Amino acid sequence: MTYRAWNTKTVDRAALKELTAAIAQQNTEELEYQNMDEEWSEEKYRSVLAAQQKEAGLLAGILAARGITDPAEALTLLAGEEELSDPMLLTDMDKACERILRAIDEGETIVVFGDYDVDGVTATALLYQHLKGMGAAVKCMLPSREGDGYGLSKNAIQSIYDKGCRLIVTVDNGISAVEEAAFAASLGIDLIITDHHLPHDTLPQAVAIVDPRRADDHSPFKGLCGAGVAFKLCAALNGCPPEEMLEYCGDLAAVGTVADVMPLTGENRTIVKAGLRQLQNTDRPGFCALLEEVGLAGKPVTAENISYAIAPRLNAAGRMDSAVTALQLVLCEDEDRAEELAHKLSDINIQRQETEMEIVKAAQELLDAEPERLEDRVILLWGRDWHPGVIGIVASRLVEKTGRPVIVVSVDEHGEGKGSGRSVQGFNLHECIASCADILLRFGGHAMAAGLSVREEDLQTLRQRLNDWAARECPVLRTPPLECDLSVHLDRLTVESVRRLDQLAPYGADNPSPVFVLEMAVVEGVYAVSEGKHCRLRLRQGNSSIYAVWFGMHPEQVPYSTGDVVDAAISLSVYDSPRGAQLSGRIIELHPAGLGNTAAEQAALVQALRRGTPLTPEQKESIAPERSHIITVYRELQARRWHAEDLQPLFAKLGEENTGRTLVAVAALEQVGLITAADRGGAKFWELVPATGKKNLADAPILKCLEER
């Protein structure tokens, strides 16, 4: 397990008081206005104001914790939506509009060329529908993930040319298609690129390149996704304020924005809020069928619903089959056909989940067979014929588990590997991969996610090169802390105060759902959920208790029992039960009550030592155990079963300041064969190995490393 610190933000008490008062007054005035037929006495106003102050404190606390301390700024944020900037401020938007409008006037066929992910599909649908509504002769085309790969290809361009089309408009791709753009130009095809990815030094040859991340672009908001840029293009073609365009295609832009994990701030917040409202009352048969399929018909739709229910199904088409299925659903105008497609996408998504778990299992078996891979700063895993459509998700899962950058590569029958990598905050995966460009066939991406192609015979060299770069650039790779907003007490929480947090939504990138810390909470029970795939804990503070689900953690993996006292990092929500509205939680992390951040800091040093990172004498001394401490650790492991994947309860028992020494002791005992991590009922526990002769602790490699000067 990767241990990480918790960073609970500090709140200025004076600012909190001022914010609470401002929010309460605003809410009271709104209530008075809504009840303007009723005359309010001064006494009633004061009474309502006092009640509002009680309920506004939690919301004000989150705002203050996130640095929003000015009441005017806070009220503006809570009021709703930022104005959308003029689409014509995007560089080359005028050129793009001029060429497209000319094509419409002259009856030219326009090909909208998208991508196979949700952003690419929604961007394609958005622009296709709008151009069709303008009377254009328009077709759309999506690449195949396996057959074509990402973005424009010469084969696709040739196919478009052979069909007599002479204008291509890309959405969510094209900014890096330098060779392909030159090929299109050589055939006499005009190319308009709309994209949101970071350009390379050389821009493609095109009639227009609309990308807010161009160095010479002066539009105010740079966080648009591909569907967001397509939305701006539609507004520019219409010559209307973009807010008006939201009424027609805000749902598509919102789904693309959330699915592509774009920051839900600024203009994206406006787009997504409008799109979510539209989704709840959508008249698109495709979205109606999909909402019915996932059990959201007639219910409020949130950004989280898009992330965890809608987007995975739309994405599954491009991962496992053809993204055309997702596009057909979004564009479908027949209810029966839409229902068929929505059900098909769910079936494909189940297939995706099964395939993903097979590869996760295979990857874990690799790590179990070669545990030294876990000491790598960058974990590179590969396998024959792993489905390339899901290796990115597998990489994400392994990053969550290991706390390190992970690249997963699928090797085909021709000996070529296609890889997808995910990173952690503070480690630029793209730069790391770029340092190996001479042995790669292709690569691309950004700091947090990247892809590559490599020959099978170069994979071992690639593993070494990646880790050499990481050793130079990030000698001690610390896991980013868990950012917590507020420490709260259950006795002081109310259903209404938690409900008011909805004003901060939509939640997503750069605007995460609030994280709360429950200190000194007593575990009153651990229960299996969904046949043991997840678990639910009952936690008590004072006179109040709450049920909190822990996704992906089955009961046997929980290193806490009834009666244990813990600190819990959780998110809060409200659900309707037969007993009325109730609070519920989702566990993010648990640790023993009072355990601070020293444990995570020392665990990072031990991890660095095991990877061969040179430590200072002071650092070595801080984690070097005396023989007596190793004996103490051995006796603890002998006395009871300790979870191998989460030793925080042992850290708390033996002293947080001894965390590094405890981890070194466990590693040394394992290295000399005195203990082993055994799988028992789906969880790993440390167990003693029956003695087979005398063991010498001094032979443990980790202790030898500490002795080196």
Predicted feature locations:
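Extended, charged alpha/beta regions that create polyanion-binding interfaces
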Residues: 1-54, 59, 569
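Hydrophobic helix-and-loop "lid/oligomerization" segment in the mid-to-C-terminal part
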Residues: 10-13, 41, 52-165, 187-188, ...
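Structured, non-catalytic alpha/beta "coupling" segments that mediate domain-domain communication
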Residues: 19-20, 27, 49-74, 584, ...
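Short, small-residue-enriched loops and turns at beta-alpha junctions
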Residues: 120, 145-150, 198-200, 217, ...
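Short alpha-helices
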Residues: 126, 205-242, 246-258, 629
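Acidic, two-metal ion nucleic-acid-processing modules in DNA metabolism proteins
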Residues: 132, 137, 269-364, 378, ...
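Histidine/acidic-residue-rich, glycine-tolerant segments that coordinate divalent metal ions
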Residues: 171-224
